[in-house]
């Protein structure tokens, strides 16, 4: 599998040779209008902190709903490898649907509204996802909850890029994501430890985890900044990415 993983990486050579740079990048390269990271981020550190915290909670949302779920199916539900794999596949199909639907929907209703709605949508899926009992009900719950989780994630790339100033747009989204991911890299370990401490009850642990994280993330995104429709190549002044309720934001 590791050897096969090399093949997709070779696509980078094709992309580097055949895919043009963005017009904004080309324009800024020609004019030489480029500022350093520290200069660009001056007055925007609160925005950076918000992005990192939000990405941490986002990663707790996705990893908390995916990483220990196969373990739950095997150890608590006593399903064999075939059923566990089937439910995992169904779970990932839900993720694909959610990412496509909410990503597109956010173009109409706004980024943060779409993310917040997706987070709330995860809550009623929890009983089926953890306590469905039968393969059919667990499959419905797994599909549903990943529509919500990855539906929210489907908005993230556009959201982070719109919030980022031009001069750090190639750096800031990835940095915020990776640092946020690092902050919650203990998610699977913590959930497994708590489950073992409670007699192997993965269902209650993952249910409580996702419920708390979904509510927290809905609040963060609903009241967070938005720069929906930002024009790349026109660096906004500090504060143009505004909080919910500002007249500068089209909800």
Task: Label each PLM-derived region with a short phrase.
Residues 113-127:
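Structural signature of the two symmetry-related core transmembrane helices
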Residues 166-198:
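A late C-terminal transmembrane helix in Major Facilitator Superfamily
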Residues 130-141:
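Helix-loop junctions at membrane interfaces in 12-TM secondary transporters
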Residues 98-110:
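Helix-to-loop junctions at the C-terminal end of transmembrane segments
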Residues 16-36, 230-240:
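Flexible cytoplasmic inter-helical loops of multi-pass small-molecule transporters
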Residues 12-17, 210-238:
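Multi-pass alpha-helical transporter architecture, strongest
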Residues 45-96, 184-188:
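Extracytoplasmic gate region of multi-pass secondary transporters
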Residues 1-4, 193-212:
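A membrane-interface helix-boundary motif in multi-pass transporters
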């Amino acid at each position: 599998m590791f050897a096969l993983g090399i093949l997709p990486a070779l696509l980078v050579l094709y992309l580097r040779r055949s895919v043009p740079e963005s017009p904004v990048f080309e324009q800024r390269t020609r004019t030489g209008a480029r500022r350093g990271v520290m200069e660009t981020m001056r007055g925007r550190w609160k925005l950076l902190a918000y992005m990192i915290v939000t990405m941490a909670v986002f990663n707790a949302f996705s990893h908390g709903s995916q990483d220990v779920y196969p373990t739950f199916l095997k150890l608590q539900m006593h399903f064999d490898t075939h059923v566990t794999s089937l439910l995992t596949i169904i779970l990932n199909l839900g993720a694909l649907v959610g990412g496509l639907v909410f990503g597109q929907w956010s173009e109409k209703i706004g980024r943060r509204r779409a993310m917040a709605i997706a987070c709330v949508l995860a809550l009623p899926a929890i009983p089926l996802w953890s306590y469905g009992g039968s393969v059919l009900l667990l499959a419905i719950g797994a599909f549903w909850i990943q529509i919500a989780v990855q539906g929210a994630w489907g908005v993230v790339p556009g959201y982070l890029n719109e919030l980022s100033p031009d001069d750090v747009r190639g750096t800031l989204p990835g940095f915020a994501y990776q640092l946020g991911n690092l902050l919650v890299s203990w998610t699977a370990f913590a959930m497994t430890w708590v489950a073992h401490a409670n007699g192997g009850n993965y269902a209650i642990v993952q249910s409580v985890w996702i419920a708390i994280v979904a509510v927290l993330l809905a609040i963060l995104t609903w009241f967070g900044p938005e720069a929906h429709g930002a024009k790349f190549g026109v660096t906004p002044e500090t504060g143009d990415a505004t909080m919910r309720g500002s007249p500068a934001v089209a909800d």
